Amino acid sequence: MADYQTIYTQIQARGPHITVSGEWGDNDRVGKPFYSYWLGKIGDAQIGPIYLGASGIAAFAFGSTAILIILFNMAAEVHFDPLQFFRQFFWLGLYPPKAQYGMGIPPLHDGGWWLMAGLFMTLSLGSWWIRVYSRARALGLGTHIAWNFAAAIFFVLCIGCIHPTLVGSWSEGVPFGIWPHIDWLTAFSIRYGNFYYCPWHGFSIGFAYGCGLLFAAHGATILAVARFGGDREIEQITDRGTAVERAALFWRWTIGFNATIESVHRWGWFFSLMVMVSASVGILLTGTFVDNWYLWCVKHGAAPDYPAYLPATPDPASLPGAPK
């Protein structure tokens, strides 16, 4: 007889698809699911059916348009040479308009395509959010996933639209591309006095580490007590059995305090939400209320004022002959 393993799923449950009472009553599923043996090794083996609906189709259409704009502009950088496109893919990018355009509409070849790609990407994310929210309501679920996703969308809007608007230049936006967007992150930090001194950046990183710690601790705990039925978490919320009692005792022995089966999920949801919220606040404060985070920390006693041993290095962009 097969036994249940907690490191990987050895038993794959397959049976008739059970309908769920939704917003419009009991309805049969549209589409026929199929099964994947290998995906069943790490999760549910059933694939589909997938429901797109109007908002899902719109999200797919807008997203595909944004991706095509980005890829065609990347290909144009290497004169549509397929070999060079794949060879240099990580270095190719679609860049925002130059600072000289401010908040104006630039020509397509000089940042206009970046604006169009950003517009379609925003429409795609917004349409997908509507889909996530409406599917949750149709199934009678809470809308927790939708609001976490909304926080992530807000962060994307902050770095690509809201922050450039507040400082008055599209050039502050993030380029599309693998290395280009990482280069932007480095330049953004240097321009505003080392972003690591921004407290909200620290909060965001702290919440991100907290998410990893919470998920690791919770996942390991449930796997450890699965032999006692701890994987049936919904039942254990209202009727604690030996699994939860053992898990709680372990954590009280270890750190003196334990979460409940319900509260640990609330912590994870809140921490993941605050990763994006904290990062968004930091972006919005940068360049608007704080021009140099290091000097801001020195002023408020949060960082040491290092003596200048070497002469100040001028900004290369301010030197005569530099491109404007």
UniProtKB/Swiss-Prot annotation:
(7R,8Z)-bacteriochlorophyll b binds at H181, H201. It comes from the Bacteria. Fe cation binds at H218, E233, H265. GO terms for biological process: photosynthetic electron transport in photosystem II. Pfam families: Photo_RC (PF00124). PROSITE patterns: REACTION_CENTER. Belongs to the reaction center PufL/M/PsbA/D family. Reaction center is composed of four bacteriochlorophylls, two bacteriopheophytins, two ubiquinones, one iron, and three highly hydrophobic polypeptide chains (designated L, M, and H). This is Reaction center protein M chain. It comes from Blastochloris viridis (Rhodopseudomonas viridis).
